[in-house]
């Protein structure tokens, strides 16, 4: 599913930029299904006062009445969508499997492809084959004129180059695969990032017209999965994922620092609460930490939950909501100083959620769930 480290160096060097060019007549749209609100849904966000959710089969749905009724959007894919994010009430992005990035300019009602990950990968495979072919030809020419003392090394290099070319040919002969994207976030109308499996990081500086493979800016030699990205909209950006890995930028993504890990398990989500300038990170076994200095130091947030936390939200003026396995929901009304635990009765796994007007709007297995919360909780 992922290119070899040596191939990644070549790809990073070329800094491949691509613009999706899929034509409308070749697109397969997500089917309109009456039970789509009950399908597996992985993320929820706000587009102004509108709620937008995304999940399996390319399903994106929106609601204008706090989750009571839902309409399906027109979405040109049937791939699993893992994350959805809106910069404002109109413009938003969704990402998912096969390295796909979608964009909407009408509050989530209609979507179009910005980045076709499979097309990107196929083009990359073509370029890798061309590079391998040139390297092989160059070594053959050098070997013909080589002095005896360096022939042995050149012969070994030639054998390696032949194997690289065979690998490149094999990649083109087989169906194209690429890593899924797991999260997306935009600092402003121009600059955005999407992160994913095997250390994938793609960036844009023009609102998504072009996306650039940019893994090389992070010190992630083991290609650990990157599961979550968030920021404050003022230049600070935070990325976290597998094995407790964390990265931070203080200059809008121009440079990145690896933060000292303090936990060996995986982080699945991070949310930023602008109200009190607090960053929260969470993951396996209910581990939850907060930082008041955007990742320089962390403090454990003790709670009654031991289920893995998968996602959540911290929108201005609403409770912080974190959701996870076995129907567990943590919510806070004091800016994250403390959290209350509630359990959804069916105990199915939850992927994310948000709070609004005395309600918890949750997504996960079994689709969308709206639950009332006692008045004193708000």
Model-derived features with residue positions:
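Bacterial N-terminal signal peptides that target proteins for export
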Residues: 1-9
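Bacterial N-terminal signal peptides
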Residues: 9-18
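Residue-level hotspots at or immediately adjacent to binding/recognition sites across diverse folds
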Residues: 22-378
């Amino acid at each position: 599913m992922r290119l070899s480290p040596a191939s990644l160096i070549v790809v990073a060097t070329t800094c491949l930029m691509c613009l999706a060019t899929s034509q409308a007549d070749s697109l397969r749209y997500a089917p309109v299904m009456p039970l789509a609100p009950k399908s597996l849904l992985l993320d929820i966000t706000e587009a102004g006062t509108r709620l937008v959710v995304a999940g399996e089969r390319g399903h994106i749905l929106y609601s204008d009445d706090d989750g009571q009724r839902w309409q399906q959007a027109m979405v040109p894919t049937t791939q699993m969508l893992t994350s959805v994010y809106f910069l404002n009430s109109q413009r938003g992005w969704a990402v998912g499997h096969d390295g796909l990035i979608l964009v909407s300019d009408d509050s989530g009602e209609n979507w179009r492809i910005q980045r076709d990950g499979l097309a990107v990968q196929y083009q990359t495979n073509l370029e890798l084959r061309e590079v391998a072919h040139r390297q092989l030809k160059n070594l053959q020419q050098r070997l013909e004129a080589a002095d005896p003392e360096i022939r042995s090394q050149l012969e070994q290099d030639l054998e390696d180059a032949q194997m690289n070319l065979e690998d490149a040919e094999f990649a083109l002969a087989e169906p194209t695969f690429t890593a899924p994207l797991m999260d997306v976030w935009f600092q402003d109308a121009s600059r955005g990032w999407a992160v994913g499996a095997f250390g994938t990081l793609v960036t844009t500086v023009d609102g998504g017209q072009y996306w650039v493979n940019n893994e090389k800016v992070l010190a992630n030699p083991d290609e650990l999965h990157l599961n979550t990205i968030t920021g404050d909209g003022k230049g600070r950006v935070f990325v976290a994922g597998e094995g407790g890995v964390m990265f931070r930028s203080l200059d809008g993504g121009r440079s990145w620092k690896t933060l000292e890990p303090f936990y060996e398990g995986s982080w699945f989500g991070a949310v930023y609460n602008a109200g009190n300038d607090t960053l929260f990170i969470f993951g396996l076994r209910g581990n939850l930490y907060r930082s008041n200095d955007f990742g320089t130091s962390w403090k454990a947030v003790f709670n009654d939950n031991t289920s893995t936390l998968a996602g959540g939200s911290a929108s201005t003026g609403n409770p912080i909501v974190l959701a996870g396995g076995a129907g567990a929901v943590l919510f806070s009304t004091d800016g994250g100083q403390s959290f209350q635990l509630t359990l959804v009765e069916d105990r199915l796994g939850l992927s994310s959620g948000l709070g609004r007007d005395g309600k918890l709007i949750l997504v996960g297995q079994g689709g969308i769930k709206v639950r009332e919360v006692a008045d004193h909780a708000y």
